[in-house]
Amino acid sequence: MYDDSYVPGFEDSEAGSADSYTSRPSLDSDVSLEEDRESARREVESQAQQQLERAKHKPVAFAVRTNVSYCGVLDEECPVQGSGVNFEAKDFLHIKEKYSNDWWIGRLVKEGGDIAFIPSPQRLESIRLKQEQKARRSGNPSSLSDIGNRRSPPPSLAKQKQKQAEHVPPYDVVPSMRPVVLVGPSLKGYEVTDMMQKALFDFLKHRFDGRISITRVTADLSLAKRSVLNNPGKRTIIERSSARSSIAEVQSEIERIFELAKSLQLVVLDADTINHPAQLAKTSLAPIIVFVKVSSPKVLQRLIRSRGKSQMKHLTVQMMAYDKLVQCPPESFDVILDENQLEDACEHLAEYLEVYWRATHHPAPGPGLLGPPSAIPGLQNQQLLGERGEEHSPLERDSLMPSDEASESSRQAWTGSSQRSSRHLEEDYADAYQDLYQPHRQHTSGLPSANGHDPQDRLLAQDSEHNHSDRNWQRNRPWPKDSY
């Protein structure tokens, strides 16, 4: 009779006992799985650390200038915790190699900057999208309700600003060594400016012997704006309106400058057409602008008058160029040489370049810059170059690659000297600076003896033989190509 009887709760207690019994191995397996995951994570981090160490001995592949800020210490997804780079907008990074789609390996260009993990453009874009989504979810209702009460900008203007903000690339590819460009005290092509700059070129050639490349650039680098290089319509207009430089010539010069920078030597450009920092502001060169500054306009006038009647004819245009430069805010220049003595100005510039040299050269031994960015798979599709919101030209994608044509153009740039008349200065151009900054380096750069007017005249210590009768002088370069 008891076989068929039902005891309440018996089956439940048996089932409960079975569940409690079988749950113990489940907990153990969860712990074991967690340990396996932690072990795998440590193994991956160890391999990443080893790759980070090996990268110290690898050459620089390419360089970028940042357009955003980033704190690697706070990024928990960094392959090695605490090994992410920190940078602000407008900093420079040397990229060694690609670690993954989200991470590169490289270093911040500064003294003591160590090898670290650098977020790729895809990684930064992902972070930006997450931040935007988080901001939208945590939007303040009160602030949203106030939008209707505010005066909003015109839709077209708002859309334009939004489009610009959306297309800001996190990085711009730049030369691995920022080229040095001298401007001032006035216009290149006139004796005062040419000979003050020539004294500095000679000093740099000897001071940094074996570590520097000084090259003349006759093409108008101000045409190397990304908006022009990427827009065929603008190219046609520019080429029709400019007899000085074709876009192809400018592209060739940009490639040559990138090639020179691959050696990680200092690169100094004797750029005929560059007389103002604004001319290079929208290019991919990211130059070091050095302002050779005369103490006062009276000193400059005295120096120009000392050069004879030929230079006096163009006193006004030289003074206008001087005024344009001194009106620039100090942040427009990387170095301002306002010393009265040549020795002091030279040492000032040398100190800056020595610091830059140490910042760009990691103490770890290794070969020079060899690999182009094309060596990193998929890099050329990331559109690091170009003006905001525009596609990038083949030049900018390939400018870091070795080029036989670029090498040939660098040799041809030194063959023969161009004949140009200073009358270009009096012509009117639509561009705000072109009326002052036309190329006119056709003067013979003889070296004058120092006059006794001002200590700054010592920057003009050259021969006193000049021919002031011909307005269309051909400018002989004061140093040959072979001297480099």
UniProtKB/Swiss-Prot annotation:
Expressed mostly in brain, colon and ovary. Residues 409-420 have a biased composition (Polar residues). Its main location: cytoplasm. Signal peptide: none annotated. InterPro entries: CAB1-4_N_A-dom (IPR046937), CACNB3_SH3 (IPR035760), GK/Ca_channel_bsu (IPR008145), P-loop_NTPase (IPR027417), SH3-like_dom_sf (IPR036028), SH3_domain (IPR001452), VDCC_L_b3su (IPR008079), VDCC_L_bsu (IPR000584). Residues 1-52, 129-170, 387-484 are annotated as: Disordered. One of its GO terms (biological process) is T cell receptor signaling pathway. CDD domains: SH3_CACNB3 (cd12042). PROSITE patterns: SH3. It comes from the Eukaryota. Residues 387-399, 463-484 have a biased composition (Basic and acidic residues). Regulatory subunit of the voltage-gated calcium channel that gives rise to L-type calcium currents. Increases CACNA1B peak calcium current and shifts the voltage dependencies of channel activation and inactivation. Increases CACNA1C peak calcium current and shifts the voltage dependencies of channel activation and inactivation. This is Voltage-dependent L-type calcium channel subunit beta-3.
